[in-house]
Amino acid sequence: MCPYTRAVGASIDVLRRVVLFSGLKDKQLKRIAEAMAERTFAAGEEITKEGEISVGFFVIEDGRARVTMSGDEVGQLGPGDHFGEIALIAETPRAATVTAETELRCHGMTSWDFRALVERNGEIAWEILASTARKLYENAERARGTPTRFPA
């Protein structure tokens, strides 16, 4: 992973849309945003590669990226979109390749920076755990064919 440069973090509104952070209060989201660093990718540069372990989470500030799986394009990303949140808490292979289509300016965070943040801020860790449990419950209910919402 290339080095990050410290800059003003991602916007709270963008972070609020990240499922992992959906239960956090603005004050907690601000702490995460402030811990993020700016990163720029050149057009054509691969940011993540399908099947490889990687440790970065990114929020796109400016530019466009292409998402591919098994070589087939499955999506486009632009300002306000994010990817890689699973990498913050689990060292699992990337599900897709993300390639910058234009120069891409992102705010990013590594898993070790995220871990340090949640170790210092237990309430953030607890809210993320609760949010993850709700999502697991919803997924299990959907798999059973009973789309019941778990109370927030």
Segments and roles (model prediction):
Residues M1-A152:
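Cytosolic regulatory regions built on CNB/CRP/Popeye-like sensor folds
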